[in-house]
C-alpha cells in the first residue's frame, strides 16, 4: 500500500443498521485483505459497556486488531470531533504498517465526518447557556426541546434520538451559540476534496421484518449474557455516566431498577427502541452518497463484498 504524501490512502467502510452483521463482515474482509478495524460506534469507545453495545468479543475478532474500543471510562465525554481526530490518527498508523484501514460501525455521523474530512472548529459556549438549556429541559420537558431542534435543524434531529437529551442539548447549544445549524457547520467545514479514497459497503435486508427478527434475537441473547447487571451499573452511576445513561440498552431498564415496572415490559421496550434506532440509521445512510448496498441475508454476501473490495484496491 502506497504511503506517499501524493497518493490518497484507501479506506474501506462497512456500515448499516444494528444487528446487520457488520462486525462479522468487517473481520472477514480484514482477514482476506490484511486489514485492521477502526470502530465507528459512539458507545463501544467506553470500557465496561460490553453487552449493551454489542461490543466485539475476543473470539469474534479472530486475531484482527480492533481500534477505538475500550479507550475511555463511561464518565468521560467523547464527541464526533474527538472521533474524527482519533480515526485520522489510527488510519495513518494502519496505512503506515501497509495494512488496510476498515471502518466498521453504525454511527453515521462518525463515518461521514471521517470519510469526508470534516474540520471541526473550536467554539466557545457563552457563559450560562449550558445551564440555561439544562433548566429549560427540566421546565419544558424533553419533547419540547426535541421539537425545537426539529424546527431549527431537522437534519441534526434525524440523527439524534429524541430521548438522547445530551446530544439534543448539544445541538441546540451549537445553534444558539453560533446561529448556525450543525448540518451547516458540517457543510461549511468540508475540504475541497475527500482525504481518502474510500469504498463504503452497506448492509441491509430485502424485508424489514428480517432485520427486526435479528434485533429481537440479539436482545434476547444480551439478556442471557447478563445485560441486566451491566445496565444496573449504569443506573447506579447515572449521575456521572451521562452518555451511557441516555444510551439504548441501558435506559430502558431504569424503570425496573426504580421499582416502577416489571422486567418484561422493559425488555420489549428495548427491542422497540432498537428497531426505531435501526430505522434512523438506515435513514442516515440512505442520504449518504456512494454506498454500495449489499443484501445482508444473501448466502454469498461475503463473496460479493470481497469482489467489490478487490476491484476497489486494484484501482489504486
Give the ranges of each region predicted by the language model.
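Phosphate/pyrophosphate-binding catalytic cores of soluble transferases and nucleic-acid-acting enzymes
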Residues: 1-316
